Amino acid sequence: MNKRQSDIIKVLYRNGGYMTFAELAEMMNVSVKTVRNDISAIKESLSEKSSVETKPHVGVKLTMDEAEWKNISGKGDCADKEICFFIIRQLLKNGNLTAQGLAEKYYIGRGELEKILEEVSGWFMENHILFERKRGKGISISYSEFNYRLACLSFYREYIPFFEGKVNVGDAKYAFLNRSEYSAMCAALDGFDPDRAARSIIETEQDFGLEFNYDSGVNLIFLISLCILRTRKGKSVTMPKTAKCPTDGESGRIFAEKTAEKLEKEYNISLSEEEIKFMAFAADISEIRQFESESARRKFEAMNIELCRFTVKAVNLISEVAGIDLREDRFFVKQMFMQLKATTSRLKYGIICKNRLLVQIKTKYPNMMAVAWFMENIFEKELELEINEHEVGFLALHI
């Protein structure tokens, strides 16, 4: 079966009803005779569970077994995922899209299109972006710059395989990504090269004597690259109004200022006060993997005195609930401090960092989850923050 015949199957399957040979010929940009020959070939290749029905003056209709459809399409659910990728990418790049153009590009019937648009609408809602459909105007989105940037990050992380190979790049010199991962990030940033931004971040990490974990490091490179990219486009961010949290500290701000100095020289741009605040936010929500020395750790703790006090209270509570004195376990206390730095910052801004291990943690370590949930009280009492189960799962991993 050739590609055109596969495309005809997709069109008929998604349409769900009769289509004329002329309609198919126009879509495939071939003659009606060619379509008739293709339909004959398709009939011969289908299993007994599937069939192609033709009616004079009505057209052709495909009835196909679901398993055979997935086998023939070669994609199954991935086909819908690819269409979702296209829609989200176009809307994030251009702000609008016509449903007709989408249907023509992917040969999607109305029922299939509605299903996909419902999924896309849910994705944008989850990322705090307004998704609108207006008759005669198509599909559009509206957003704050802050939510737009976080949505771009979510989109990149969720659809990395779809970005890979879309731009040709060499190996990264500073960004700790292999070629395919680096290519995906460049594509998600519309061709922007984040390697120099990665160098500035790494140099600031060295100044602080710390190292962020892998996932946080990737997110930080992406978000700070967006600062450069969006500033060049004249798209300024405004940080959301949030109540001051006792554990805020000064480390994020200092990290952002040092990084901004490097970036301004590297890219010959001027970063606004709001951009520096955004970079501080990006640093604060990042998880630290380790400090290079005790001296570096103490300096960082001095920038976050109230967080140190909150960590002590958290450790005391965990010790009491678990029936194990963990106050003298220096490794545990240090790990809890680093986790709480990112957790409190994410909760302050209402950021839900999805815990990919949550199901396994809840299944294998229910007792640790139960202990971690006891911390809900001090988050509310001391910080006026509402903790979610994803963050509880992160904390449970350290108990």
PLM region descriptions:
Residues 1-399:
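A cross-family "folded-core" feature that marks the main globular domain of proteins
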